[in-house]
Structures are given as C-alpha cells and as structure tokens.
Amino acid sequence: MRPLTPRQAEILELIKRNIAETGMPPTRAEIATRLGFKSANAAEEHLKALAKKGCIEIMPGTSRGIRLPVEEEDNSESGLPLIGQVAAGEPILAQEHVEQYYQVDPSMFHPAANFLLRVRGDSMKNIGILEGDLLAVHKVQQARNGQVVVARVDDDVTVKRFEKKGNLVYLHAENEDYSPIKVDLSFQSLTIEGLAVGVIRNGDWL
C-alpha cells in the first residue's frame, strides 16, 4: 500500500473510530465538519485518494458507502472466524458455526473484532450493510442506545440498531421497509452477541 499523507491518515482513523463508536462510517459532511473542511466535496477528494491507495472502498449511491477492504490469504484455523448459520441454543462462536477463517488483523477495527458474520437480507442497507457482506463484530454482552448490534432474540440472530426503554428493547432496521423488532424483556429472551465495528465486502476475491 502506498504511504498516506498526514491528512489521509487522519481521515482513515476518523472512519475507523466512527465505525467503532456508532457501528457505521461517517458521511462526507460529517468528515468535513469534524476535520474543518470547507465542503463535503473536499472530503470526497480525500476519500477517492484513500480508495486509490487501497485503504477503503467507496460504494456509490449511499452517503455512508465507505468500507474497509481485506483479502483472504488461506483457510487455516487462524485469523477471524466467519460465522454462518447459528443453531438455536448454541453459542455463536461454537465450532460448528464457523464456515472458515479469514486472515484479517482484528486490530484493524476499533475495538478489535472477534469474529465475522455473514449478512443476510437488506434491512440495514441504508448504512451500507448489504446482503452478502461480512460484518466485523466485537463481542460484548451489553450495548448503548444507538449502537448497531448483533442480537439474539429467542434464538434468532439479527443485526439492528439498539434502543432500550425500561423493560422494552427496540431493534431498528436501517431500511424503511422493515418495522422495528420489539422485545419485552419481562417474558422474551434477548442476548447481545456483539457490536458491529466494520463491514467487509464479500466479493469473489475475498
């Protein structure tokens, strides 16, 4: 990878930090505001330069269409495990759920990722989490309102934005075609499996 200018390194760190804190990349306008650019167009030029250097991928058609690329080196049992279908009642990292391992440095995400989860469906497409993507997940058991989480609701695993109000939890999609999932903790089971800390495109080359 070609060396980055100080400004490019600053933007790349901002992208990683925003994903760690909110579960999604920043918009061009947010980058411009935080780093003092006069316009979102200035941020766009820096993003294009980062994309040319292989540091990010830009997905057209969405304001948050920024992804962190990665390449698979082999399928040995090292690196980050890719979780496929999750059986009811089983821990998400149970060996039988692991499809393969990717040679991904967990520290490229902030906080560090513990596993990858294959995205199914388009309920989070408005923040750039698309069908077939690999979602980098930092394993935790608790979440704050507004964070994008991997949650298990009565043994169904889903990726949604978390909101808790008293004894009720709402899991919000980022797609207007989907209604929130309402969970009443007084009689329903909900487990936080982790926080979304990054998205990797699941292309044929990966």
Curated annotation (Swiss-Prot):
Keywords: Autocatalytic cleavage, DNA damage, DNA repair, DNA replication, DNA-binding, Hydrolase, Repressor, SOS response, Transcription, Transcription regulation. The active site is at S123 (for autocatalytic cleavage activity), K160 (for autocatalytic cleavage activity). GO terms for biological process: DNA repair; DNA replication; negative regulation of DNA-templated transcription; proteolysis; SOS response. It catalyses: Hydrolysis of Ala-|-Gly bond in repressor LexA. Residues 28-48 bind DNA. SUPFAM superfamilies: LexA/Signal peptidase, Winged helix' DNA-binding domain. The record marks A88, G89 as: Cleavage. Gene3D superfamilies: Umud Fragment, subunit A (2.10.109.10), Winged helix-like DNA-binding domain superfamily/Winged helix DNA-binding domain (1.10.10.10). Homodimer. This is LexA repressor. It comes from Shewanella sp. (strain ANA-3). The gene is lexA.
